[in-house]
Amino acid sequence: MAQTLNSYKMAEIMYKILEKKGELTLEDILAQFEISVPSAYNIQRALKAICERHPDECEVQYKNRKTTFKWIKQEQKEEQKQEQTQDNIAKIFDAQPANFEQTDQGFIKAKQ
């Protein structure tokens, strides 16, 4: 029971690291805590459970017997920033010229 609680606490730490880093693997868990492979698998299982409770924040991907944890919210924020930038660029290009005219003396004034 103590090992389970300890693994879960370590998984919570890895969850916070995942949020900052954006992606984690078993190797990251091993490097972070300098533990044995079986202990790292216990932490990985606990981290999977945490991700299952927060599907809008974390995603577990499996490829070639390798488990990767990905932080989803960060990707969504980057996509939203890109969309906002594209919208701003479109607004700039779609903007109508200001209602100004140049006077005989070279000054610019608003059209009336």
Swiss-Prot record:
The lineage of its organism: Viruses, Viruses incertae sedis, Fuselloviridae, Alphafusellovirus. Gene3D superfamilies: F-112 protein-like (1.10.10.1470). InterPro entries: F-112-like_sf, SSV1_F112-like, WH_DNA-bd_sf. SUPFAM superfamilies: Winged helix' DNA-binding domain. Pfam families: F-112. This is Protein F-112. Essential for virus function. It comes from the Viruses.
